[in-house]
Regions:
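ABC ATPase nucleotide-binding domains
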Residues: 30, 71-77, 81, 85-225
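Helix-to-loop junction immediately C-terminal to a conserved catalytic motif
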Residues: 49
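Conserved ABC transporter NBD signature motif
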Residues: 57-65
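Glycine/charge-rich catalytic "coupling/switch" loops of P-loop NTPases
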Residues: 237-288, 313-353
Length: 353
């Protein structure tokens, strides 16, 4: 493995930021550290970079134990959330900064800066200053500067957080394509699920300093292995009285159910399938238009459940009556999570994850 974290612990006063953190990264992979604020993901990134020292545990990069190495000795490039460009330097000088610190000659620096400007599609802007660039352009320059010394590992701390939504979407695609092109092993921190799912080869879910689950985006989304992951990923509804729902039995005391919006099929009352007894009678409690669909909160026998309604169903508003069929749910028992299909679909309906 190219990067290995083994039993990492880190405490800041009374707060344990990392609790026995262990995971591995293959060479050339793009990894997303995903979790809520305060979950420890940025601390992990900073310890890999050498900007924070772990209290215990080992970090390996390219087979080398780096515990005692300084950031400059680890061969790591770091892209900060707020760009951290030098405002008094031109684009050229910002990218060249690390190369000058390394003592590279002028010819090499010019060649490398030109190469990186082409890579980030900003050739011709080398004489501009950071305040003359857009947010997206500044982030590209920050990436070029991090790549200039040819690091072995690229670390990005919420690289798109300070950028508006449209540009952020474009930069996700661009970053994925750029990292694939140069083949550098990379780790980025984010609290945005869509970003992690779209960009990462693998996702590391963090919570309260612990690693909850590691896997590719599809596996993380479809097969959550812990209670936290099941509740955190997706726009889920969490309910305890799920035995009220048609096609599901209560699995016992201490259990709860997680229902994703895509598990719910909605019909208007005039639909031919509306008389199917397996469908729930539901009332729209809240409806938000999302452009390509309506995001709704349903009241089903007192249970609040999120769902999506396609435009073909027409506009939905608070108080509308609809029919809802719930295909499946995740049952959580302690830290065990498993899928249960609606019994009207299959007699053998339990699938352990």
């Amino acid at each position: 493995m190219y990067v290995e974290l083994k039993n990492i612990n880190k405490r800041f006063g009374d707060c344990q930021a990392s609790k026995d953190v262990s995971f591995e990264i293959e060479k050339g992979k793009l990894i997303g550290l995903l979790g809520p604020s305060g979950s420890g993901k940025t601390t992990i990134l900073r310890m890999i970079a050498g900007l924070e020292k772990q209290d215990s545990g080992d970090i390996y990069i390219n087979g080398k134990l780096v515990n005692e190495l300084t950031p400059s000795q680890r061969g790591v490039g770091f892209v900060f959330q707020n760009y951290a460009l030098f405002p008094y330097m031109t684009v050229y000088d910002n990218i060249a900064y690390g190369l000058r610190v390394e003592g590279k000659d002028k010819a090499y620096i010019k060649e490398r800066v030109t190469e990186l400007l082409e890579l980030v599609s900003l050739s011709g802007l080398e004489k501009r200053y950071p305040d003359q660039l857009s947010g997206g352009q500044r982030q590209r320059i920050a990436l070029a500067r991090a790549l200039a010394p040819k690091p072995e590992l690229l670390l990005l701390d919420e690289p798109f957080a300070a950028i508006d939504a449209k540009v952020r979407q474009e930069l996700r695609t661009w970053l994925r394509r750029t990292i694939d092109k140069i083949g550098i092993t990379s780790i980025f921190v984010t609290h945005d699920q869509d970003e992690a799912i779209e960009v990462a080869d693998e996702i590391v879910i963090t919570n309260e300093g612990r690693v909850e689950q590691v896997g590719d985006p599809v596996d993380i989304y479809l097969h959550p292995k812990t209670s936290f992951t099941a509740k955190f990923i997706g726009k889920s509804s969490v309910i305890t009285d799920y035995g009220k729902l048609k096609g599901f039995n209560d699995e016992g005391e201490g259990t709860e159910a997680v229902i994703r919006p895509e598990f719910v099929e909605l019909l208007t009352n005039d639909s031919p399938k509306g008389n199917d007894p397996s469908y729930e009678d539901a009332m729209v409690e809240q409806s938000i238009f999302r452009g390509d669909s309506f995001e709704v909160i349903l009241d089903i026998d007192g249970l609040k459940i999120k769902a999506n309604s396609p435009l073909v169903n027409g506009p939905l508003k608070s108080g509308d009556r609809v029919k809802a069929f719930i295909n499946m749910i995740y049952i959580i028992r302690g830290e065990e999570t498993y899928q249960v299909k609606n019994s009207s679909l299959d007699d053998s309906n339990t699938y352990f994850i």
